[in-house]
Amino acid sequence: MIGIAALVVGIVLGLVFHPSVPEVIQPYLSIAVVAALDAVFGGLRAYLERIFDSKVFVISFVFNVLVAALIVYVGDQLGVGTQLSTAIIVVLGIRIFGNAAALRRRLFGA
């Protein structure tokens, strides 16, 4: 319940204040969001399978975001940032859809 309230407050604050993302951070934002979504869907799946551990969830959430950002940063330094960003999005997208399929099977039996 606290998480839902925090989400609503965050959305409202974002709509009211219209924050701008610094140009330096923009390449990493989309990767961070997708990495965070991967952790959230993994957490939902674990919750439905009754193996959810909040410590594992928080560590997974932070670690996914940091590793994805680090990979993009290294790619930018090597001049292949766009290709690595695409690779990260594809890999995390596959994981998200895998978790979504498991959630669908668990919730709807299909």
Describe the residue ranges of each PLM region.
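Membrane-helix boundary elements
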Residues: 1-26
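C-terminal ends of transmembrane helices
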Residues: 41-50, 97-105
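Short juxtamembrane and helix-loop transition motifs at transmembrane-helix boundaries
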Residues: 17-26, 44-55
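Canonical alpha-helical transmembrane segment with a positive-inside/aromatic-interface signature
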Residues: 86-110
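Alpha-helical transmembrane segments of multi-pass membrane proteins
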Residues: 15, 31-42, 68-69, 91-98
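Cytoplasmic-side transmembrane-helix entry/capping segments in multi-pass membrane proteins
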Residues: 1-5, 28-29, 53-63, 86, ...
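Membrane-helix boundary connector in multi-pass membrane proteins
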Residues: 71-85
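Structural signature of hydrophobic alpha-helical transmembrane segments
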Residues: 24-37, 85
